[in-house]
From Swiss-Prot:
Role of this protein: Catalyzes the formation of N(7)-methylguanine at position 46 (m7G46) in tRNA.
Residues that hold substrate according to the record: K117, D149
Organismal lineage: Bacteria, Bacillati, Cyanobacteriota, Cyanophyceae, Synechococcales
GO cellular component, one term: tRNA methyltransferase complex
Keywords from the UniProt entry: Methyltransferase, S-adenosyl-L-methionine, Transferase, tRNA processing
Active site positions, chain numbering: D113
Designated gene of the protein: trmB
Protein name in the entry: tRNA (guanine-N(7)-)-methyltransferase
NCBIfam families xref list: tRNA (guanosine(46)-N7)-methyltransferase TrmB
Enzyme class: transferase
Family named by the database record: Belongs to the class I-like SAM-binding methyltransferase superfamily. TrmB family.
């Protein structure tokens, strides 16, 4: 079951400043994978343990999950991984400005809170403004991966991304939806959905050469 928090409430509108990359990771010359809405962080913990040539950052709006994820990261001694509590739509813009060109190589948004009621849809994490920030921060060829078990959420994310013209579907995964996760590991939510026989919708994009005016 998803545990929702309202990202538009006053508390979650406060800016939580994320450290600059050089203050986050031991090896700052490695590419960064940013996972937005990382939940308990099991996906990134597995990815970081298996990919020493990448740095990983997970951000999550539910603070207890961040505490648990960061505690496990420390226990495992993973220096190429960090977790932070923040509202991505509020706190990431300034952090993006601290990045060197080409430093952010992959962004994933996996199973975001669906906010089914029409009046609540403005709470969804991916909107046109936030996508514009991602397009500004990702170099040509960098990846954007999305997935959800709610078709209406997936359709909305796909529409926002493709109407922006900043991203193209990855040629290797150009079908309407990916049948399999392109990564070696899954999130907790994906494992649960698969176990329950729920269909998962996915798409992998890369940043194209369309400039930002």
């Amino acid at each position: 079951m998803r545990q929702h928090v309202n990202p538009l409430s006053h508390f979650f509108q406060l800016h939580n400043e994320l450290p600059r990359p050089e203050d986050l990771f031991e090896s700052i010359d490695l590419p960064i994978h940013l996972d937005i809405g990382c939940a308990r962080g099991k996906f990134l913990i597995d990815m970081a343990a298996d990919n020493a040539q990448w740095n990983f950052l997970g951000v999550e709006i539910r603070e207890p999950l961040v505490f648990a994820a960061e505690k496990e990261r420390i226990e495992l001694g993973l220096t190429n991984l960090r977790f932070f509590f923040c509202n991505a739509n509020i706190s990431l813009e300034k952090w993006f400005l601290s990045l060197e060109n080409g430093q952010l190589k992959r962004v994933s948004i996996q199973f975001p809170d669906p906010w089914f009621k029409k009046r609540h849809r403005k709470r969804r994490v991916l909107n046109q403004s936030f996508l514009f920030l991602l397009a500004q921060s990702l170099d040509i060829g960098s990846e954007l991966f999305i997935q959800s078990d709610v078709i209406s959420v997936m359709d909305e994310m796909t529409e926002i991304i493709e109407l922006s013209h900043f991203f193209d579907r990855h040629s290797k995964y150009s079908e309407s939806n990916l049948n399999a996760n392109p990564f070696k590991f899954c999130t907790e939510r994906e494992k649960y959905a698969i176990h329950q026989g729920v269909k998962v919708y996915r798409q992998l994009y890369f940043r194209n050469s369309t400039g930002i005016l």
